[in-house]
Amino acid sequence: MINFNYETEFSLDNEQAFTDWLSAVIVSEEKNEGEINYIFCDDEYLHKINVEYLNHDTLTDIISFDYTVGNEISGDIFVSVERVEDNAKDFNVSFEEELKRVLAHGILHYCGYKDKSDADAELMRSKEDEKIAMFHVEQ
């Protein structure tokens, strides 16, 4: 089950479309969907988590806590809407595209993808692009 929680004024326009897409992303990686909680927040909220739990005194766009067991992926994914907005501007993409990238990024970590080395980051980026292309909304 995928849940969306809001600790900021932001909210997704079409939660069902995002849920369907993220579920498809999980299936495409041959994983089972457990309980995944997305928590949308601001920089201050996520910075506190970054300092308290990871001992990193920096801003970030996403922090994920992985509770995956075997093939069933579960976890809490915190997303700073402010960072996503700034990154979208920095990368010259729409807010929605950058948001999809971040949402997929969290799932991909749970599927075992890493991004610390250049090679891993390149694979992660490729997987993000692949998963973003899977998103569609029925018109």
From Swiss-Prot:
| Cofactor(s) recorded in Swiss-Prot or TrEMBL | Zn(2+)
Family per UniProt? Belongs to the endoribonuclease YbeY family.
Task of the protein: Single strand-specific metallo-endoribonuclease involved in late-stage 70S ribosome quality control and in maturation of the 3' terminus of the 16S rRNA.
Q: Which residues bind Zn(2+)?
A: 105, 109, 115
InterPro entries of this UniProt entry?
A: MetalPrtase_cat_dom_sf_prd (IPR023091), YbeY (IPR002036)
Q: What is its EC number?
A: 3.1.-.-
Mind listing the UniProt keywords for this protein, alphabetically? Cytoplasm, Endonuclease, Hydrolase, Metal-binding, Nuclease, Ribosome biogenesis, rRNA processing, Zinc
Keyword Cytoplasm carried by entry = yes
Its GO CC terms?
cytoplasm
Q: What would you give as a GO molecular function for this chain, any one?
A: zinc ion binding
Query: Record's SUPFAM superfamilies?
Result: Metalloproteases ('zincins'), catalytic domain
Q: Where are the transmembrane segments?
A: none
Name of the molecule in the record? Endoribonuclease YbeY
Q: Where in the cell is it found?
A: Cytoplasm
Question: Gene3D superfamilies in the record, alphabetically?
Answer: Metalloproteases ('zincins'), catalytic domain
NCBIfam families (alphabetical): rRNA maturation RNase YbeY
Cofactor, free-text remark: Binds 1 zinc ion.
Answer yes or no on keyword Transit peptide. no
**What is the originating organism of this protein?**
Flavobacterium johnsoniae (strain ATCC 17061 / DSM 2064 / JCM 8514 / BCRC 14874 / CCUG 350202 / NBRC 14942 / NCIMB 11054 / UW101) (Cytophaga johnsonae)
Identify the taxonomic lineage of the organism of origin.
Bacteria, Pseudomonadati, Bacteroidota, Flavobacteriia, Flavobacteriales
Q: Name one GO biological process term.
A: rRNA processing
Q: Which domain of life is it from?
A: Bacteria
Q: What class of enzyme is it?
A: hydrolase
